[in-house]
Amino acid sequence: MTTLTSGSPTPMGAHFDGVGINFTLFSAHAEQVELCLFDDNNQELRIPLPARSGDIWHGYLPGGKPGQRYGYRVSGPFNPQQGHRFNPHKLLIDPYARALDRKVGDDPSLQGGVSQPDYRDSAAVAPKCIVVHEEYDWQGDRRPTIPWGNTVIYEAHVRGLTQLHPDIPADLRGTYAGLAHPAMIQYLQKLGITTLELLPVQFHIDEPRLQKMGLSNYWGYNVLAPYAVDPDYASGREGISPLRELRDAVKALHQAGIEVILDVVFNHSAELDVFGPTLCQRGIDNASYYWLTSEGEYDNMTGCGNTLRLSQPYVMQWVLDCLRYWVDSCHIDGFRFDLGTVLGRSPAFDQHAPLFAALAADKQLCNCKMIAEPWDIGLGGYQLGNFPTGFSEWNDQYRDAMRRFWLRGDLPLGQFAQHFAASSNLFKHRERLPSASINQITAHDGFTLQDLLCFNQKHNQINGEENRDGSDNNLSNNFGSEGLVADDAIWQRRKACQRALLTTLLLSQGTPMLLAGDEHGHSQQGNNNAYCQNNILTWLDWGSADRELTAFTAELIRLRQQIPALIQDSWWEDGDGNVQWLDSQGEALSDGAWEQGCQKQLQIRLSQRWLVVINATDQACEMHLPVGEWVVIPPFEPSEHTEPLTVWNGSAHTVCVLTQKF
């Protein structure tokens, strides 16, 4: 007969100590917690956890071994008005689970009940947790620790980046092993990427409505088990677990000097709204894990049906433990927090929230790169510029400003300069540095750079929502022809703007983030919300990549790393030699010029030596350069071209960089 001893209330989760397994589960309102053990024939053995220390239920299984499958059944009141939705008929996963044995299908027995409990048992179809104890030889691996000033982020999806790469073996494409392949790493190095930011690799599931349409959550933001490595991106090679394969990839990237940042989801869970499945937190302690209204309904500040209550001490601890796990177990270098405003809610946003304070005080986490998506859809959800020191933030105002400047022509010059200078109006306070601004023109959600120049309207019909999903405010410009088919004159204008936007991004102060594929000319055929498209629409087509554009981008990144004003990560001040704003005559911009509205011709002198010359008008122009002799440099002119200039003749929608000849 299998029995449990009391064990220990720490550490959280299921841990093998060499002779047995200690199990712990937090629930402040439960009346009983049953540990459910499953054998190879899926026979279930239920054993009540014998001990409770405060709100931690725990027990120890002598002789238990790694690979043991388990789950929980939690009993307590079913009183939705009070926030309680306990239902012991539902098998629940451990919030600390390191692996699960299956994905989740759209099965009605997973429903916990809306106003009354659902009595159908879910064990036959629910995922089971797997006890994981995997040693790993890191072979002296060390984090690259790239200074923020030198950081160039590349946002990518594991499958999308590697699935069609011709030099990666077919059985490794679309996988963590594909990331580690020399062909992939050499490409990132040649491009000049310092930091690879991966879309979620935490264990996620597909929403029932997507399953009904035969689609999947390709991006992976519907996370069920945040401690578990998603097996969807594992090669399945014998003897190599998803965890090991991800570790191998991180180690290989580190050896190449490339950091790895994970996009993590702690704003909501995969249980969705009240009609979603009961898989974990809802059945463990709904009132503790989620923000609820006074009537017990979910306060949906995420648009995903629920919002995790990260101000609750044990829920906060769950997040902190998870981040430490990824750093300790997988040597992750940093995190990008999806809908990051939720991190500071209590329920209003507070930059001094307990979770922020805990992150700053944690010796392991305080040195990681922390990036917030600084908004959610709740009251007061837009918080750009308001995160604490130690965080950088996705800067959508930079994105919109640069799109307006180059594609719409309606941005005042002062706003352009502010955002070019790391959005100093937003970030130059409380000892924050220019690197706090994560500059971007595009990201995974929205048009790709190619589509930004080819489509004025979104084309999301294949997503199954009648083209209602995705933003309608794209600030794009198709230059007179909707779609990828256009005459040569239109394509010349598109290509000029494409290079101008890339140049602006990579030569602005702040931290640049490049969307994977933008350097290829990758198109999603006008789909600006391709979250459910796990197919050639989102996979990078390496065979048709624009190699000239790729080389142009790589040269820009190399140029960026040479300019002190861009990499020293300190604010530009008047007279410090970092920046001069000049007019088309090479003279300092007057107060009147700053105030006259949408000036579209200017010169930006960086670190005295480099000159960024901008013509964002629809017409060719002649611009007089500052006193001295100036030489156009790669990638704007072949390296053998050294004829000095005093006047620059620029085509419409172009930017050029010159260096002073001494």
Curated annotation (Swiss-Prot):
Lineage: superkingdom: Bacteria
UniProt keyword annotations, A-Z: Carbohydrate metabolism, Glycogen metabolism, Glycosidase, Hydrolase
CDD domains: AmyAc_Glg_debranch, E_set_GDE_Isoamylase_N
InterPro entries: GlgX_C, GlgX_Isoamylase_N_E_set, Glyco_hydro_13_cat_dom, Glyco_hydro_13_N, Glyco_hydro_b, Glycogen_debranch_bac, Glycogen_debranch_GlgX, Glycoside_hydrolase_SF
Pathway(s) this gene product operates in, as recorded in its UniProt entry: Glycan degradation; glycogen degradation
EC number: 3.2.1.196
GO annotation, biological process: glycogen catabolic process
Molecular functions (GO terms): glycogen debranching enzyme activity; hydrolase activity, hydrolyzing O-glycosyl compounds
Pfam families (alphabetical): Alpha-amylase, CBM_48, GlgX_C
N-terminal signal peptide: none
Protein's job: Removes maltotriose and maltotetraose chains that are attached by 1,6-alpha-linkage to the limit dextrin main chain, generating a debranched limit dextrin.
Family matches, as PANTHER family: GLYCOGEN DEBRANCHING ENZYME
Protein's recorded name: Glycogen debranching enzyme
Native species: Yersinia enterocolitica serotype O:8 / biotype 1B (strain NCTC 13174 / 8081)
Gene, per the UniProt record: glgX
